[in-house]
Amino acid sequence: MKVTLTAILTCAAVLVLHTTAAEELEESQLMEVGMPDTELAAVDEERLFECSVSCEIEKEGNKGCKKKKCKGGWKCKFNMCVKV
């Protein structure tokens, strides 16, 4: 009986700790409203630069825009990465 009770209490404690850790992780990953999107802006600028460079290189060779450079739901259009 003691073993079963100990096992149940241990399982409950682990479940509570796991749930608390998951909630803390989720809260830490949320963005606060009003905070600047500097990380996203940096990614967008990087994609724009990569796309422009790849398009300019291919333009000189009279080829179309290289769509492989823009990844993750983005495509290259008019020498810019645009969200699809």
Curated annotation (Swiss-Prot):
<dbReference type="Pfam" id="PF08089">
    <property type="entry name" value="Toxin_20"/>
</dbReference>
<keyword id="KW-0800">Toxin</keyword>
<feature type="disulfide bond">
    <location>
        <begin position="55"/>
        <end position="76"/>
    </location>
</feature>
<protein>
    <recommendedName>
        <fullName>U4-theraphotoxin-Hhn1b</fullName>
    </recommendedName>
</protein>
<keyword id="KW-0629">Postsynaptic neurotoxin</keyword>
<comment type="similarity">
    <text>Belongs to the neurotoxin 12 (Hwtx-2) family. 02 (Hwtx-2) subfamily.</text>
</comment>
<keyword id="KW-1015">Disulfide bond</keyword>
<feature type="propeptide">
    <location>
        <begin position="23"/>
        <end position="47"/>
    </location>
</feature>
<dbReference type="GO" id="GO:0005576">
    <property type="term" value="C:extracellular region"/>
</dbReference>
<comment type="function">
    <text>Postsynaptic neurotoxin.</text>
</comment>
<dbReference type="InterPro" id="IPR012625">
    <property type="entry name" value="Hwtx-2-like"/>
</dbReference>
<feature type="disulfide bond">
    <location>
        <begin position="51"/>
        <end position="65"/>
    </location>
</feature>
<keyword id="KW-0528">Neurotoxin</keyword>
<feature type="disulfide bond">
    <location>
        <begin position="70"/>
        <end position="81"/>
    </location>
</feature>
<keyword id="KW-0732">Signal</keyword>
<feature type="signal peptide">
    <location>
        <begin position="1"/>
        <end position="22"/>
    </location>
</feature>
<dbReference type="GO" id="GO:0035792">
    <property type="term" value="C:host cell postsynaptic membrane"/>
</dbReference>
<dbReference type="GO" id="GO:0090729">
    <property type="term" value="F:toxin activity"/>
</dbReference>
<keyword id="KW-0964">Secreted</keyword>
